[in-house]
Design a protein with these regions (language model features):
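Major-groove DNA-recognition helix of helix-turn-helix-type DNA-binding domains
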Residues: 17-41
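Polyanion-binding surface elements
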Residues: 1-21
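P-loop NTP-binding core
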Residues: 4-6, 37-41, 46-262
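Hydrophobic, helix-prone linear segments
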Residues: 1, 16, 34-35, 165
Length: 262
């Protein structure tokens, strides 16, 4: 006889997901967890529908667009709202890692471990920020050569994240490049969040970003048909100054690209 789903107390489900009981109750009320109420207490159905983990890559090959700042601030704000957040630093310059106060990173703590073993390294828990981080270091530069030597290696992070169920959101800070390491981060998630500096430089950079996004989407079609057809999910204006006509023209240009990033 087939065994039906059993009920899990809110406290136990909170411990499993690594979030607070209040957050579990909120997810129940929002319809993101299937649950039943027995008397005064809620119970989550084991095997019921759970909100899918969302993963996005902050991506642009143009430096100075505010990509890393956005990754940090989005991660912090989501964590502040009660979501379980993992940040992944894929840039050997390790600016995100440094800004979060993480020092003395060992190679096995970075994505170098992923490329060697196929497994994510254990993340660092940042208590002050209430989020987790897979840090970067200069050692990560060695990954570029390893990725060039292995077919389909740029899908390693995507594959590993599909097994990761502890987080509501994964935010990946890509390096300003169009190389293999950038592709590893770009193809790992559910699409790209693209910061666009409101300047001529920012608009010019969009051409390369859109070409790269199209190439990534075509590559994913062969192995991940569930990937969204529109791979750029959002353009985020940065360094905007409402007092300048140039910035306002660029902002209008970004707004006109809704078909590319609805």
């Amino acid at each position: 006889m087939e065994e039906g789903p059993h009920l899990v107390p809110v406290s136990e489900m909170a411990e499993r997901l690594g979030i607070t009981r209040e957050r579990v109750r909120q997810m129940i009320l929002e319809g993101k967890l299937e649950a039943v109420r027995l008397g005064r207490y809620w119970y989550v159905r084991q095997g019921g529908k759970t909100r899918l983990r969302q993963a996005y890559t902050l991506f642009t090959h143009a430096g100075g667009a505010g990509k890393t700042s956005l990754a940090r601030d989005l991660g912090y704000e989501l964590a502040r709202r009660g979501f379980r957040v993992l940040l992944i630093d894929t840039d050997p310059q390790a600016n995100l890692t440094s800004w979060l106060g993480v020092r003395e990173v060992q190679p096995q703590e970075t994505l170098l471990h992923l490329v060697k073993t196929g497994q994510l390294p254990p993340p660092r828990s940042l208590k002050d920020w209430n989020l987790d981080l897979i840090p970067a270091s200069l050692d990560l530069a060695r990954v570029e050569v390893r990725l060039m030597q292995r077919p389909l290696a740029t899908l390693l992070l995507r594959t590993a994240l599909r097994k990761e169920e502890r987080y509501d959101f994964v935010l990946i800070d890509s390096l300003p490049s169009l190389g293999h390491l950038a592709a590893l981060g770009a193809m790992a998630g559910d699409g790209l969040l693209v910061p666009v500096e409101t300047s001529v430089k920012g608009v010019e950079a969009l051409v390369g970003v859109m070409e790269a996004a199209q190439e990534y989407r075509e590559a994913l079609e062969q192995v991940a048909p569930e990937a969204p057809k529109t791979f750029v999910r959002l353009f985020i204006p940065t360094k905007y100054d409402a007092r300048t006509s140039g910035d306002n023209r660029v902002l209008e240009k970004i707004a006109s690209l809704r078909e590319l990033a609805p």
